[in-house]
Design a protein with these regions (language model features):
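Sec/Tat signal peptide C-region and signal peptidase I cleavage site
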Residues: 20-24
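Short alpha-helix carrying the canonical HExxH Zn2+-binding catalytic motif
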Residues: 35-51, 65, 246
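An active-site-proximal "capping" alpha-helix that borders the catalytic cofactor pocket
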Residues: 60-77
């Protein structure tokens, strides 16, 4: 009997340690690059929402408009962190390396990454020179980026200003963050990330409530006009983490 009691205690200890290790693994934090890249994804979805909610003209593929908006919006919202956020998203695009078909609305991922770097560099060439150089942006291409990126930035600043919340206005149209009970959804929804998302969403003077869901789903990030909801799938978070935590 003493032997059996001792054996049970040992087994209980092993199971307790294993459960603790599993819980620690389950709750491990995402890499900063993953959270940075996904913040650009949120900004991109805000761009989609602005186009639809305010009936802005769509003169080129929507994904391109939203990409440019996101880069400028991140720069205006987090000027001290823009380099790390845009660099992380560019690295994620390069890791994806998708080559769309000839008639796709999407550019290839290498081009999308380059566009992010080019556009941010053009907002403040002296500040972002080293970042541009790291990604291979120099010479004539850098000069071209300085020219057209400044114009794109100016255009977006004017549009954003038109739809911005007045400084002293009460925010009423940003809903609570909804988070699925999954490993990657919980890992993304840190207090800091929630604060960043709220800050981005609350900068716009929405006429109806906008919410963000981090959901248990297979897919990427989407904007639903009917539900006025931005959704990020936990499978998308997992993909980013595998690409950017190396």
């Amino acid at each position: 009997m003493p032997f059996l009691i001792k054996l049970v205690k040992i087994m209980f200890f092993i199971l307790t340690v294993s459960a603790g290790q599993a819980l620690a693994h389950e709750q491990r934090e995402l890499s900063p690059k993953t959270k940075d890249a996904l913040l650009h994804v949120v900004a991109h979805s805000i761009g989609n929402a602005m186009l639809r909610e305010f009936d802005l003209p769509i003169l080129v593929p929507e994904v391109d408009i939203a990409d440019d908006f996101a880069t400028v919006f991140i720069y205006l919202s987090f000027p001290e962190r823009a380099r790390s956020i845009i660099s992380a998203r560019a690295r994620q695009h390069l890791a994806d390396g998708k080559e769309p078909s000839m008639f796709s609305e999407y550019r290839n991922d290498r081009h999308r990454a380059g566009r992010l770097i080019c556009l941010l560099y053009g907002q403040d060439p002296s500040r972002f020179k080293s970042m541009a150089s790291y990604f291979g942006l120099k010479g004539r291409e850098a000069r071209v980026c300085r020219d057209f990126s400044a114009e794109i930035g100016r255009s977006w600043r004017r549009i954003i200003k038109t739809y911005s919340m007045p400084p002293d206005a009460r925010v009423t149209e940003v809903g609570n963050l909804m988070v699925a009970d999954t490993r990657y959804a919980r890992a993304l929804a840190t207090t800091e990330f929630q604060q960043d998302v709220y800050f981005l969403l609350s900068r716009i003077d929405w006429h109806s409530q906008i919410t963000l869901n981090i959901d248990d789903c297979n897919g990427a990030a989407t904007w639903s006009r009917n539900g006025r909801r931005i959704t990020i799938c936990d499978s998308y978070i997992e993909r980013f983490e595998k690409q950017l935590s190396k």
